[in-house]
């Protein structure tokens, strides 16, 4: 079973949203509230959090009917990883937090969709997903990461 994630930037809140794409959604993100990242809600993640899907390395909120938490990139320091050390993304995000002119929302969305998702698909490097999810998500991983190559972008 393929795991399809929709990557969207919300310029109004300056957050990156990763949401599962259901078969009925035709490529649109699953509707529902993303919730407040600063105050965890026990009801935000159902008891049956989808572990049966065998998507190792995803946080439990990835299986919530409301979709995963929005990832708030508020610090370039969080993004200084081997994943993007050679990219300009940390500098761009830092400039955005300072209110300076930087990469457009469209360009950032293209970066995540075309570069990161493509790498996950072709190389099966799940650690990339883990890094970005842990960058802003309050939920813990379902289980330890394992090699996989079934991620596709919407």
From Swiss-Prot:
Family note: Belongs to the orthohepadnavirus protein X family.
Complex formation: May form homodimer. May interact with host CEBPA, CFLAR, CREB1, DDB1, E4F1, HBXIP, HSPD1/HSP60, NFKBIA, POLR2E and SMAD4. Interacts with host SMC5-SMC6 complex and induces its degradation. Interacts with host TRPC4AP; leading to prevent ubiquitination of TRPC4AP. Interacts with host PLSCR1; this interaction promotes ubiquitination and degradation of HBx and impairs HBx-mediated cell proliferation.
Protein localization: Host cytoplasm; Host nucleus; Host mitochondrion
Biological role: Multifunctional protein that plays a role in silencing host antiviral defenses and promoting viral transcription. Does not seem to be essential for HBV infection. May be directly involved in development of cirrhosis and liver cancer (hepatocellular carcinoma). Most of cytosolic activities involve modulation of cytosolic calcium. The effect on apoptosis is controversial depending on the cell types in which the studies have been conducted. May induce apoptosis by localizing in mitochondria and causing loss of mitochondrial membrane potential.
Record region (Mitochondrial targeting sequence): 68-117
Keywords: Activation of host NF-kappa-B by virus, Activator, Apoptosis, Host cytoplasm, Host G2/M cell cycle arrest by virus, Host mitochondrion, Host nucleus, Host-virus interaction, Modulation of host cell cycle by virus, Transcription, Transcription regulation
Protein name, UniProt field: Protein X
Pfam families the record matches: X
GO BP, sorted A to Z: DNA-templated transcription; symbiont-mediated activation of host NF-kappaB cascade; symbiont-mediated arrest of host cell cycle during G2/M transition; viral genome replication
Organism of provenance: Hepatitis B virus genotype E subtype ayw4 (isolate Kou)
InterPro entries assigned to the protein according to its UniProt record, in alphabetical order: Transactivation_prot_X
């Amino acid at each position: 079973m393929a795991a399809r994630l929709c990557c969207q930037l919300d310029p109004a809140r300056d957050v990156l949203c990763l949401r599962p794409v259901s078969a009925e959604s035709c490529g649109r993100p699953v509707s529902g509230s993303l919730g407040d990242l600063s105050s965890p809600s026990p009801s935000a993640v159902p008891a049956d959090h989808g572990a049966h899907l065998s998507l190792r390395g995803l946080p439990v909120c990835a299986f919530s009917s409301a979709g995963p938490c929005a990832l708030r990139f508020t610090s370039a320091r969080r993004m200084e990883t081997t994943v993007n050390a050679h990219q300009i993304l940390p500098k761009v995000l830092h400039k955005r937090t300072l209110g300076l002119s930087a990469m457009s929302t469209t360009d950032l969305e293209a970066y995540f969709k075309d570069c990161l998702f493509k790498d996950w698909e072709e190389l099966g490097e799940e650690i990339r997903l883990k890094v970005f999810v842990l960058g802003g998500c309050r939920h813990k991983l379902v289980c330890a990461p394992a090699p996989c190559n079934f991620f596709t972008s919407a």
